[in-house]
UniProtKB/Swiss-Prot annotation:
Belongs to the beta-defensin family. This is Beta-defensin 11. GO terms for biological process: defense response to Gram-negative bacterium; defense response to Gram-positive bacterium; innate immune response in mucosa. The gene is Defb11. SUPFAM superfamilies: Defensin-like. It comes from the Eukaryota. One of its GO terms (cellular component) is extracellular space.
C-alpha cells in the first residue's frame, strides 16, 4: 500500500507542472493570436511594400505585418 501511494504521489508531482516545452508553445500560440487579433498576418521575411511591421510572431521570429490604410 505504501509503495502504491508513493508511486501515485510521484506520478502526480511529475505531471502536475508545466514543462518548458508547454510554456514555449503557449508563448508561440499567443504570439500568433496577438498578431491576428491586431488584424495582421505572420510573414517570414520582410513585410511587403504597402504593409508595416507590428511586431513579431513566435517561435520563428517572423514579422507580424499589416496593410497600411
Amino acid at each position: 500500500m505504501r509503495t502504491l501511494c508513493s508511486l501515485l504521489l510521484i506520478g502526480c508531482l511529475l505531471f502536475s507542472y508545466d514543462t518548458p516545452v508547454v510554456g514555449f508553445l503557449r508563448r508561440s500560440v499567443s504570439g500568433f493570436q496577438e498578431c491576428h487579433s491586431k488584424g495582421g498576418y505572420c510573414y517570414r521575411y520582410y513585410c511587403p511594400r504597402p504593409h508595416r511591421r507590428l511586431g513579431s510572431c513566435y517561435p520563428y521570429a517572423a514579422n507580424c505585418c499589416r496593410r497600411r490604410r
